[in-house]
Amino acid sequence: MAPLSLRDCKAWQDAGLTLSTTSNEVCKLFDATLIQYATWKNDSTLGGIEGCLSRINNTDPNFVMGHVAANGLELIGTGRSPLVDKELDDALKTMSDLSKSQALTEREKLHVAAVETFADGNLPKAADLWERILQSHPTDLLALKFAHDCYFYLGEQRQMRDSVARVLPYWKPETPLSSYVKGMYSFGLLETNFYDQALKVAKEALAVERTDSWSVHTIAHVHEMKADLDSGLSFMQETENNWKGSDMLACHVYWHWALYLIEKGDYEAALTLYDNHIAPQCFASGSMLDVVDNSSMLYRLQMEGVNVGDRWKNLVQITKKHTKDHMLIFNDLHFLMSSLGSKDEDTTRQLVESMQELSKSPGEKQQHSLIKHLGAPLCQALIEYNGGNYDKAVDLIYPIRYQILKIGGSDAQRDLFNQVLIQAAINSDSTHHQNLARVLLMERDIGRPNSPLTQRLIKKWEALHGLLG
């Protein structure tokens, strides 16, 4: 990416995005933070996101938007929870107090309110507040990115797409980072099943900036959803040098690469990717995206009958630290996979019991309100599946299969639960469940033709129960 000119106070004002500080250095550091967030890359020449935010705070500790960015990024990362993290909770209070002690623009006030609302667990309302900002300030990249990520956590696929579509015309080709906004739009198109259009838009973004790892990620998804494995593998290999430097997303792109290999049944190659890239990057970063990718990959391999050795025991050392965070049900389910895989019964019990406790009085916490009817049954289904109680696993997952979208994540990520349901139904002693598995396999085969994984599952069904058709 060509070096971008960092905006000073006047440049922000000229863009209609006035910042309440008199420090040009702070304005430039804030811009540097946004650039790194948008490009999924901690840039050492800019000091990394953490370095930029630290310098902002040292230079102008009263700069509210610095606190908004710092707290918002922590919350959106979902790796720290104000429920159990006093330092984060104190930082949020500092932000709120500062916002009340000085004159701010209406846009800045809305940013503070949105971060406070997200911290309180009311994700839909937080998204609405970021949308209010975008209605008046369509080039506010922080509001756009926060809204995009929030919709992703809510499973609101159309909103994720349309939120970007509403502002995209304001991002002219000469506007810095406009191609990255186009890449965001490509992902929304993908998640709403406009695969060909998503591919076209992602390629347009990559034609401007080939290191745009989010657009690479969109294309990886398209090949995954179409089971076009050879094209996916070729694309990964040909572009690896372009995206592997995006430290905040590279692990996830390698995870997509590994999904192709698992789909093909090339488990050794998948484990090699895990050991060489996916696990090391997770242990280095500790980021939630990397953590859930590690859990998901090991679980998928285990469902395929692969012995993953001590890898679960290594991973649970990270996941058990987040047992009582309860930021997202999606995260909790992946922590549970890790504790089950490592046979850590105490951590499993703590996770489930603390979830159940929070479900009793969720208040405005949107994720906690989903525990009783969605999170708890899914957790119990994984526990039953792990114990070989396939009948119970099916009875828990099948009634809510069309609600699983609400836990957030992508279609590719949530496909794990489709696979659990099918595997459990195949292995069930119930004739009813076996018949369910048969029709689910037919559904899957039509929706994703030429999938080797589906063909393996069909052969497994036929080996146990006779011809499928």
UniProtKB/Swiss-Prot annotation:
Name of the protein in its database record: Tetratricopeptide repeat protein 38
Chain's gene name: ttc38
Family indicated by similarity: Belongs to the TTC38 family.
Keywords on record: Repeat, TPR repeat
TPR repeat boundaries on the chain: 107-140, 179-212, 251-284
